[in-house]
Amino acid sequence: MSTKVKISEQVSAMFQKKLPKKCSDPGMFTIPCTIGGVKVKRAMLDLFASINVMPYSLYETLKLGPLRETSVVIQLADRSNTYPRGVIEDVLVELDKLVFLAHFYVIFMNHDEYATSILLGRPF
């Protein structure tokens, strides 16, 4: 059974409009920040992450005091697991003129000058 539907000129014009140009994927969203006087050029913001992560090498540079032990297991994007060396609490993170307190899980990472070294989760 077929039915005919009468369409006005206005509706017809809406269907004829072209779709907007598709934007390219910007990759990851990064911003500069300062932690303990150390400038981090590219901190990755991940709105789906519920934790903040920093590499052990940066933790050593910052001299933020002893790590608190943790039993947390972090599952990475490739579904592998990593075990943080510990957590450091109440770290001042400066984003432009805003200052936040954040907890960071400290993990061992291979150094790569082109990779982001900090992951900032949902609180940012």
Question: Language-model segments: which ranges?
Answer:
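Proline- and glycine-rich low-complexity segments
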Residues: M1-F124
